[in-house]
C-alpha cells in the first residue's frame, strides 16, 4: 500500500515537474516568437516608409515630365500658329494686290470698250464716206470709159485670168519638164536593172529540121518504090522532104513548127524501126500526134510552175504549151512570152507593183497566137476573149489589149508588160521582118484553100510555090476537084502578092477497107 502511495506520489511529482518544465520551455518559445514578430513588423514598417518615399519621388518626376511635354507642345503650337499667321498675312497681301490689279484692268477694259465703240462708230462713218466716194469714182469711171461696173469687172477679171493662166502654164511646163527628166532617169534605171538581171536564151526559129540517118541507103527506102513512101510522108505530114546529096541527112522544110516537129519525130521513128511503108507512116503519125498533144500540156504546166503561178485554167495552160510551136517574125512565141514575163516581173517589182501578177500578164499577153486559123480575129482579140472566158484577172486582159495600143495601160503591171514586150521584140536581131512576111503569105495561101467546102487539109510546100489540098472524097468528086483547084488558084491570084507562080494540087483519095475474119 505504502509502495503504491509512494509510486503515486512519485508520479504526481514527476508530472508536476514535467508541467513546470514544459511551461518554462513554452514561455521561452513565446518570447522568441514575439521578438521575431516585432522584428518583422519593424521590417514591414521600414519597407512601407521606403515605398512611400519612392512613390513621392515618382509622382514628382511624372509631374515634371508632364509639365515639360506640355510646355514643348505649347511652344510648337505657338510656332506653327505664328508661321500660318505669317503665311495668311502674305496671301492676304497678294489677294489685295490682285484685287487692285483686277479693278485697274476692269477700268481699262471699260475704257477700251468705250474707245472701241467710238472707233467703231467712226469706222462706220468712214466706211460710209468711202463707199460714197467709191460709188462716185465708179460713176466717174463708167462715164469716162463708157463701161458699166459689171463690164469693167469682167474686163479686169479676164486680164487677171489671162495673166494667171500664163503664169500657171509656165509653172506647169517647168514641173512637167522636171518630172519627165526624172521619169526618164527612173525608167532608164529600171530598164537597165531589168535587162541586166534577166539572162534569157535567144530563140530564133528556122524553117527546116535535119534528121540524121546512119547511112544513105535509108534515103532510098524513105523514097520508096515509085516514090510512094515520100509522097505519103509529104501528104500525111504536110512538110517538104528534101533528099539530096547531103550525106547522112534528110531535110524537112515547113513554116509550121508543129507539123515540122511531128514530121521530124515520125521520120526518126521510121528510120529507127526500119519498117517504112504507107500504113506504118499513118499509124506513127497518129501516135506521135497524140504524144505531142500530151507533151504540150506538160510543157504548159512546167512553164506555169517555173513562173510560180497558180489557178490557171487547164485550157490556158495547154495554149501556153502550144506557144512553143508558134513564131512571130522568126522569134519563138513561147521564148518571147517567157522573156516578157520575167522582164515584166522585174520592172513591176522595181516600180512597187505585183511581181506575180505582172508575170501572169506577161506569159499570157500573146496567148491568142496559140489559137489556129480556125478562129477569126487578131491575136489580141482572141487572147482577151479566151482570158475573159476563163475569168482571168482584169489586169491580164488590160495588158493583152494595151501591149498593142488597143487600150491604155491602167496599172503598173500592164505598163510593165508593155515595156517588157517592147524590150523583147524591138531589140536588134530579135525578129526578122522578111521571114515573117513570107510566113504570113504561106499561111494565107493555106487558109484560102481550107476555106473551101469539102477540103480536109491543105499544106503549102516548096517554099510556098506549091499547095497540096486534101479533099474529102465523099463531098467532092473528080470533076469538082478540078473546079476547086481552079477556084483556089483564082482566089490566090486576087488576094495574095507573090513572086513567080504557085502550083495548086487537089488530091482526092478513096479508100475501101474491110477485114477478113
Swiss-Prot record:
Alphabetical list of InterPro entries matching this protein: HD/PDEase_dom, HD_domain, HDIG_dom, KH_dom_type_1_sf, Ribonuclease_Y, RNase_Y_N
SUPFAM superfamilies to which the protein is assigned, alphabetical: Eukaryotic type KH-domain (KH-domain type I) (SSF54791), HD-domain/PDEase-like (SSF109604)
Please give the superkingdom of this protein's source: Bacteria
The transmembrane residues are 1-21
Q: Which family does it belong to?
A: Belongs to the RNase Y family.
This chain's function reads:
Endoribonuclease that initiates mRNA decay.
Write the protein's name. Ribonuclease Y
Q: Which organism is it from?
A: Campylobacter concisus (strain 13826)
Amino acid at each position: 500500500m505504502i509502495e503504491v502511495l509512494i509510486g503515486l506520489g512519485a508520479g504526481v511529482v514527476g508530472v508536476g515537474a514535467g508541467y513546470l518544465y514544459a511551461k518554462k520551455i513554452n514561455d521561452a518559445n513565446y518570447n522568441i516568437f514575439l521578438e521575431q514578430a516585432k522584428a518583422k513588423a519593424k521590417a514591414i514598417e521600414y519597407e512601407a516608409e521606403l515605398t512611400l518615399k519612392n512613390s513621392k519621388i515618382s509622382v514628382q518626376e511624372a509631374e515634371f515630365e508632364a509639365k515639360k511635354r506640355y510646355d514643348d507642345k505649347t511652344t510648337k503650337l505657338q510656332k506653327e500658329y505664328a508661321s500660318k499667321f505669317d503665311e495668311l498675312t502674305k496671301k492676304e497681301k497678294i489677294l489685295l494686290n490682285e484685287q487692285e490689279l483686277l479693278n485697274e484692268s476692269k477700268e481699262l477694259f471699260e475704257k477700251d470698250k468705250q474707245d472701241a465703240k467710238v472707233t467703231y462708230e467712226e469706222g462706220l462713218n468712214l466706211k460710209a464716206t468711202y463707199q460714197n466716194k467709191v460709188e462716185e469714182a465708179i460713176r466717174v469711171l463708167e462715164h469716162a470709159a463708157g463701161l458699166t461696173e459689171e463690164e469693167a469687172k469682167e474686163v479686169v477679171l479676164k486680164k487677171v485670168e489671162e495673166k494667171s493662166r500664163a503664169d500657171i502654164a509656165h509653172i506647169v511646163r517647168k514641173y512637167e519638164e522636171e518630172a519627165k527628166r526624172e521619169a526618164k532617169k527612173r525608167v532608164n534605171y529600171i530598164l537597165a536593172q531589168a535587162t541586166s538581171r534577166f539572162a534569157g536564151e535567144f530563140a530564133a526559129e528556122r524553117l527546116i529540121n535535119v534528121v540524121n540517118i546512119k547511112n544513105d541507103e535509108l534515103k532510098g527506102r524513105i523514097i520508096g518504090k515509085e516514090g510512094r513512101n515520100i509522097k505519103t510522108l509529104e501528104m500525111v505530114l504536110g512538110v517538104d522532104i528534101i533528099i539530096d546529096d547531103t550525106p547522112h541527112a534528110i531535110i524537112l522544110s515547113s513554116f509550121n513548127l508543129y507539123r515540122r516537129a511531128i514530121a521530124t519525130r515520125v521520120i526518126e521513128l521510121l528510120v529507127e524501126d526500119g519498117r517504112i511503108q504507107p500504113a506504118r507512116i499513118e499509124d506513127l503519125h497518129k501516135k506521135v500526134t497524140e504524144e505531142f498533144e500530151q507533151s504540150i500540156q506538160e510543157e504548159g504546166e512546167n512553164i506555169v510552175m517555173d513562173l510560180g503561178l497558180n489557178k490557171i485554167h487547164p485550157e490556158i495552160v495547154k495554149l501556153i504549151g502550144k506557144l512553143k510551136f508558134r513564131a512571130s517574125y522568126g522569134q519563138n512565141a513561147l521564148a518571147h512570152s517567157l522573156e516578157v514575163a520575167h522582164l515584166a516581173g522585174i520592172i513591176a517589182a522595181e516600180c512597187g507593183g505585183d511581181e506575180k501578177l505582172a508575170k501572169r500578164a506577161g506569159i499570157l499577153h500573146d496567148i491568142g497566137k496559140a489559137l489556129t486559123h480556125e478562129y477569126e480575129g487578131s491575136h489580141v482579140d482572141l487572147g482577151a476573149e479566151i482570158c475573159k472566158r476563163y475569168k482571168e484577172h482584169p489586169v491580164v486582159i488590160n495588158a493583152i489589149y494595151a501591149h498593142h495600143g488597143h487600150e491604155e495601160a491602167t496599172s503598173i503591171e500592164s505598163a510593165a508588160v508593155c515595156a517588157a514586150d517592147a524590150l523583147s521584140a524591138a531589140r536588134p536581131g530579135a525578129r526578122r521582118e522578111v521571114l515573117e512576111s513570107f510566113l504570113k503569105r504561106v499561111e494565107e495561101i493555106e487558109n484560102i484553100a481550107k476555106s473551101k467546102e469539102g477540103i480536109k487539109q491543105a499544106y503549102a510546100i516548096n517554099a510556098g510555090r506549091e499547095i497540096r489540098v486534101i479533099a474529102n472524097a465523099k463531098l467532092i468528086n473528080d470533076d469538082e476537084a478540078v473546079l476547086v483547084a481552079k477556084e483556089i488558084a483564082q482566089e490566090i491570084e486576087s488576094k495574095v502578092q507573090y513572086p513567080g507562080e504557085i502550083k495548086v494540087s487537089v488530091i482526092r483519095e478513096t479508100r475501101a477497107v474491110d477485114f477478113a475474119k
